[in-house]
Amino acid sequence: MGRSLKKGPFIADSLLRKVEKQNDTDDKSVIKTWSRASTILPMMIGHTIAVHNGKSHVPVFITEQMVGHKLGEFAPTRTFKGHIKDKKGGR
């Protein structure tokens, strides 16, 4: 179920301030954040945001198709190493 329209999208205040500051100064340095729940807004297009995945920060370049999604969707937290092969012979 989606978020109520009267509330608007969630974005962390610190992240919003950093993006607005970079838009004012035309700076495109990487923004580091732990806020995976923040919604991607149109003002973020063209920025690179390093999203924390629990171990390290994964750089995510924001494009138009990402608007409306959450930052955490683009920084996977689990690594799949493959299924275990069956033992030959078994029982």
Swiss-Prot record:
A Gene Ontology BP annotation from the UniProt entry: ribosomal small subunit assembly
Pfam families: Ribosomal_S19
Keyword Magnesium: no
InterPro entries the UniProt entry points to: Ribosomal_uS19, Ribosomal_uS19_bac-type, Ribosomal_uS19_CS, Ribosomal_uS19_SF
Alphabetical keyword list: Ribonucleoprotein, Ribosomal protein, RNA-binding, rRNA-binding
A GO CC annotation given for this chain: cytoplasm
GO molecular function: rRNA binding; structural constituent of ribosome
Job of this protein: Protein S19 forms a complex with S13 that binds strongly to the 16S ribosomal RNA.
HAMAP family: Ribosomal_uS19 (MF_00531)
Family, per entry: Belongs to the universal ribosomal protein uS19 family.
Entry protein name: Small ribosomal subunit protein uS19
UniProt source species: Parasynechococcus marenigrum (strain WH8102)
Gene designation: rpsS
